[in-house]
Amino acid sequence: MSRITDVHIHIQPWWQLKPTVQEAMRKGKEDHWELLISMMDDPRALLEVMDRSRVWRVGLVNYPSPDIMGFDDSTNAFAATYAQANPERLIPYGGVHARFTKDPTGDVDRLIDLGIQLIKIHPPHQAFPANAYTDGLAALGKIYRRCEERGLPVMVHTGTSIFPGARSKYGNPMELDDVAIDFPDLRLVMAHGGRPLYMEEAFFILRRHRQVRLDVSGIPPGKLLEYFPRLAEVGDRVLWGTDWPSPGVKDLRQNIDQFLALPLAPEQQQAILETNALALFPMESRTHA
């Protein structure tokens, strides 16, 4: 396969990470930490890794989380600028922090003007549930509404997070039931499938709401069918992702090869690795109305 898209990798301004967060990120990567740091500065280094791994495109996950992770709003400009090195292969993601924004609608518009292709909401790292607009966080509802109006997909982290200060109680995918009902034309990507505590909830949301897609990043590929034994039923809405180089994810290609060893039909493998991402990020339309 020559058109593999990994919709979930972390190329971010890691120099903004809080010291305790950076320590957790660095664990297990000591022997190649400097290479990873250089990759955050140099898109050519990432493209070389992608070429070796036979990965065509990647989604560059970025979002503000100043109080928990350390990332400020400049992470959006970082992603947009980084992706300019190869707009065909590098897809920039950004975020608007619902607890801190003073102009949620305008901030979404400004990200689109920057070239951001997807908004990332990270409940455990931003300290609110994905449906917090139902309980007073009006800015979050305005973010969803503007993304719905502009056709901008929204990725929501589901499941736990190991980083210091992360609020894993906000990672339950069931909160997306409200979002999918209240914003029926919003394209939602459910990152990580609720791993490891909320897999059944994630599958329920996926089956109930056609506009929700599942991103399998952060799930060991060899356990994917153990966690989601009925994956083939929703195979047209499953997106390939690795979460690389987050803790526990060593290699882009290794994960792909482990996935290809699963007892899935070739057409299902192709849909997950290639076709479904092309429907979300079509090459002929990388801008939004």
Residue ranges and their predicted role:
Residues 12-15, 65-68, 98-102, 126-128, ...:
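Active-site environment of divalent metal-dependent phosphoester hydrolases
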Residues 15-21, 105-107, 131-133, 166-168, ...:
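Short aromatic-enriched loop/helix-cap "lid" or pocket-rim segments at secondary-structure transitions
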Residues 4-7, 60-61, 93-95, 188-191, ...:
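Active-site neighborhood of phospho(di)ester-bond hydrolases with catalytic His/Asp-centered motifs
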Residues 56-57, 65-162, 208:
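Active-site gating/metal-coordination segments in enzymes
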Residues 43-47, 76-83, 108-109, 140, ...:
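Generic structural signal for well-ordered alpha-helices
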Residues 2-10, 14-57, 234-237, 247-289:
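Mid-to-C-terminal alpha-helical segments outside catalytic/metal-binding sites
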Residues 8, 50, 79, 111, ...:
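Conserved, mostly hydrophobic/aromatic
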Residues 117-118, 132-240:
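Catalytic pocket-lining loop regions of alpha/beta-barrel enzymes
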